[in-house]
């Protein structure tokens, strides 16, 4: 199994290193035969001798083209003759490539920016992470002593915790009497002990949570200050900091540094990405948070250190558990795109598609298009096109709703209509499909590069799903599931890749044709469903729709929906297929992207309504949840309105307990960097003035008091609120918390703010908003 690949330099020549695990043992293989190269397209092949003479200079050394080779390739499907220009060292490429490009005989150069080690994997057909090796995983986390305003790395590391499949432990340098705590004499000894543990346990994968930005850089700073070499690489090297776009990434040679933060922010959508929030979202279990000021206070006073140690140990344990949860999918993506796990776990979906295409282009003898220049990139950013169709919802409360959607709409369109840069407006084509509204033509005489690859991916996914049904082995079933999910993620990213401004195979015409066909097919479904089957379509968004038959019985609606699916699929071309996705007992649609439905088991699905961020008070969240439940479970909008009025009345009468009023916001930067002073910053500054250490990442809970002046001046720490001394600002909580939360729902039924605040009789047709068609 290939874990990673890089190259070193020996006597001026590059040497590829493959970091591998075979039969349970780690080894490094070397290849001294692979040479860097670029492609050049010449106006006149007889000028190659002139091109061969082009030289450059690097570190005082003359850089030359050491060999050339004429090769027959394809470019966007068309035959092309190019020259392969070999160089001595990968670092010679940036030195000489522009001189080659500017030569009068050269039309253009290609594939000059593919990193050498990645090029090796592609050309040799090697796939990282393939094989059945058992990988050793170790997670770690650090706790530091931080005081407000201190520069990064100034305060000591006070604890290093680590976890693997056998244990979770903490190393520290103050006496803490707990079975999982190891006490050493100093910070220096703690770091050295941690290095020994890494060497003893010899993990293949080191898991961190934000280790690229925090744990590793902090560890490196402290180690440098204390005169320690962080030799944790399997070749005896120290961690290497690299720039990837706007971020720093840390590489450990021979061990895969798997930073969960990048993977999780790409994979799941959460209001906040603290370790605690992520752990609770994934496992459904809360994890205690101990804040920086509490850690500092405990360390400096020597009190409550057991709590800090437990928190540190649980951090490492949580990181390990999350690693086990997310690694299998990333390993499958690594295999799928053929690049190392370290890179894949830090890649956007656009980059994953690109690495997949680069490998497939090489296999099909295609020269890859170049990345855009800065000027071209800016031009692409300015381009726009019409997206998917969204129908304004039919407002009110509806019953017996079916949800129908297209199976992989955009990938199916790309394959069915052969939408690809190499088939676009192809001269001499006899058969082509014309995109509706936009008019772009796609040739059907030859299979397009991207549609054919996408077709193979979807075929493979279908085979895997069949195999999943057949296999009796639960482990195999889990692994197959990760594989099909990886394929789905990649396949669904191709449409977005066409419009990705940095893409090599960028194609705005392709992207806008895909959405145009998408609009055509969903509108066809809408028309046929209403005109021929008597449904009323309530809401459409891109590839799916909600519909009902007003006054219809639930079983009749389900039956007719299934009949319609069979009917429409016989009319749809190619791979396009509509599916019956679900039945909902009740639902309402407020505006585009904002709706809620409840299924027959009582499961509520909402979009665009829920207030999950922590800067909403508990009273706002609780009231919204009660309103949702009353409408969806009981079908009673008027009761929901009564609940809101009751809560508003209780707020006005100061009957709401303070714990339901606290608003929580995170401090995201040092206090002196804030220009706009929000309530949480104002409270944090008051705490800092009292000597409390405020650190980025801390969450401040505050309550807004009654009075004059800006809200920031009237916010106090939630824990300091005393009902005997303080009065909360009822008007603030009514206007800025409860009403905005419930109006997200109730405005869909024609209610306005003033209808909820005051006991007025509604004169105008409430029933016209409800539209309840009882079955």
From Swiss-Prot:
Classification via InterPro entries: DNA-dir_DNA_pol_B, DNA-dir_DNA_pol_B_CS, DNA-dir_DNA_pol_B_exonuc, DNA-dir_DNA_pol_B_multi_dom, DNA/RNA_pol_sf, DNA_pol_B_thumb, DNA_pol_palm_dom_sf, DNA_pol_type-B
EC category name: transferase
Chain segments annotated as transmembrane: none
Keyword terms, alphabetized: DNA replication, DNA-binding, DNA-directed DNA polymerase, Endonuclease, Hydrolase, Nuclease, Nucleotidyltransferase, Transferase
Pfam families xref list: DNA_pol_B (PF00136), DNA_pol_B_exo1 (PF03104)
Free-text biotechnology note from the record: Because Pfu DNA polymerase exhibits the lowest error rate of any thermostable DNA polymerase studied, it is routinely used for PCR. It is sold by a number of companies including Promega, Stratagene and ThermoScientific. Various mutations to improve its abilities have been incorporated.
Keyword Nucleotidyltransferase: yes
Top-rank taxon: Archaea
Record flagged with keyword Hydrolase: yes
Job description of the protein: In addition to polymerase activity, this DNA polymerase exhibits 3' to 5' exonuclease activity.
Xref: NCBIfam families: pol2 (TIGR00592)
Subunit text: Monomer.
Family the entry assigns: Belongs to the DNA polymerase type-B family.
Protein name, UniProt field: DNA polymerase
Species name: Pyrococcus furiosus (strain ATCC 43587 / DSM 3638 / JCM 8422 / Vc1)
Taxonomy of the source species: Archaea, Methanobacteriati, Methanobacteriota, Thermococci, Thermococcales
């Amino acid at each position: 199994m290939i874990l990673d690949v890089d190259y070193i330099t020996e006597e001026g020549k590059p040497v590829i290193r493959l970091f591998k695990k075979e039969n349970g043992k780690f080894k490094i293989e070397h290849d001294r035969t692979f040479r860097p190269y670029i492609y050049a397209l010449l106006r006149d092949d007889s000028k190659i001798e002139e091109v061969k003479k082009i030289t450059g200079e690097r570190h005082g050394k003359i850089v030359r083209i050491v060999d050339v080779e004429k090769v027959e390739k394809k470019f966007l499907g068309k035959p092309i003759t190019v020259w392969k220009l070999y160089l001595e060292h990968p670092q010679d490429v940036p030195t000489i490539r522009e001189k080659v490009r500017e030569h009068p005989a050269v039309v253009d150069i290609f594939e000059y920016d593919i990193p050498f080690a990645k090029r090796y994997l592609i050309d040799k057909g090697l796939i990282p992470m393939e094989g059945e090796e058992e990988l050793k995983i170790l997670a770690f986390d650090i706790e530091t002593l931080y005081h407000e305003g201190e520069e990064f790395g100034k305060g000591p590391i006070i604890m290093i915790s680590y976890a693997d499949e056998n244990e979770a432990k903490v190393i520290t340098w103050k006496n803490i009497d707990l079975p999982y705590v190891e006490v050493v004499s100093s910070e220096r000894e703690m770091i050295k002990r941690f290095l020994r543990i890494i060497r003893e346990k010899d993990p293949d994968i080191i898991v961190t949570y934000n280790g690229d930005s925090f744990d590793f850089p902090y560890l490196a700073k402290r180690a440098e200050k204390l005169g320690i070499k962080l030799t944790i690489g399997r070749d005896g090297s120290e961690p290497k900091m690299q720039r990837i776009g706007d971020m720093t990434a840390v590489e450990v040679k021979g061990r895969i540094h798997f930073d969960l933060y990048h993977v999780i922010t790409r994979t799941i959508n959460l209001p906040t990405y603290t370790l605690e929030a992520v752990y609770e979202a994934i496992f459904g279990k809360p994890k205690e948070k101990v804040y920086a000021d509490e850690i500092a206070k405990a360390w400096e006073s020597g009190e409550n250190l057991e709590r800090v140690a437990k928190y540190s140990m649980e951090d490492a344990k949580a990181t390990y558990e999350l690693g086990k949860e997310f690694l299998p999918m990333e390993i499958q993506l690594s295999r799928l795109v053929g690049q190392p796990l370290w890179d894949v776990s830090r890649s956007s979906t656009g980059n994953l598609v690109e690495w997949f295409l680069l490998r497939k282009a090489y296999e099909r003898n295609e020269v890859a298009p170049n990345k855009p220049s800065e000027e071209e990139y800016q031009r692409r950013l300015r381009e726009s096109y019409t997206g998917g169709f969204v129908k304004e919802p039919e407002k009110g409360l509806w019953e017996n709703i079916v949800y129908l959607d297209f199976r992989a709409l955009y990938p199916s369109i790309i394959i069915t209509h052969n939408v690809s840069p190499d088939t676009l407006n192809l001269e001499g084509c006899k058969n082509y499909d014309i995109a509706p509204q936009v008019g772009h033509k796609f040739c059907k005489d030859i299979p397009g590069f991207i549609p054919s690859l996408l077709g193979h991916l979807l075929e493979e996914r279908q085979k895997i799903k069949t195999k999943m049904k057949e296999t009796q082995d639960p482990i195999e079933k889990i692994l197959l599931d990760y594989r099909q999910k990886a394929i789905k993620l990649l396949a669904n990213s191709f449409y977005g890749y066409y419009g990705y401004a940095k893409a090599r195979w960028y194609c705005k015409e392709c992207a806008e044709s895909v959405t145009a066909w998408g609009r055509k097919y969903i509108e066809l479904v809408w028309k046929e469903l209403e005109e021929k089957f008597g449904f009323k379509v309530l809401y459409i968004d891109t590839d799916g729709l909600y519909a009902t038959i007003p006054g219809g019985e639930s079983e009749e609606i389900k039956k007719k929906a299934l009949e319609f699916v069979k009917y429409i699929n016989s009319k749809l071309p190619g791979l396009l297929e509509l599916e019956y996705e679900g039945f909902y007992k009740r639902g309402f649609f407020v505006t585009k992207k904002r709706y809620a439905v409840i299924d027959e088991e009582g499961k509520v699905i909402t979009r665009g309504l829920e207030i999950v961020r922590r800067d909403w008070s508990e009273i706002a969240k609780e009231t919204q949840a009660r309103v949702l439940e009353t409408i969806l479970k009981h079908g009673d909008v008027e009761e929901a309105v009564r609940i809101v009025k009751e809560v508003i009345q209780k707020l006005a009468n100061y009957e709401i307990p303070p714990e339901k009023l606290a608003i929580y916001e995170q401090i995201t930067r040092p206090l002196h960097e804030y220009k706009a002073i929000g309530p949480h910053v104002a409270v944090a500054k008051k705490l800092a003035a009292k000597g409390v250490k405020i650190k980025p990442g801390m969450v401040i809970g505050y309550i807004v008091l009654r009075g004059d002046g800006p809200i920031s001046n009237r916010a106090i720490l939630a824990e300091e609120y005393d009902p005997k001394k303080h009065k909360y600002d009822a008007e603030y909580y009514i206007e800025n918390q409860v009403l905005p939360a419930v109006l997200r729902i109730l405005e869909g039924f024609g209610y306005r703010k003033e209808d909820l605040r005051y006991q007025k009789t509604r004169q105008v047709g409430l029933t016209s908003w409800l539209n309840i068609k009882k079955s």
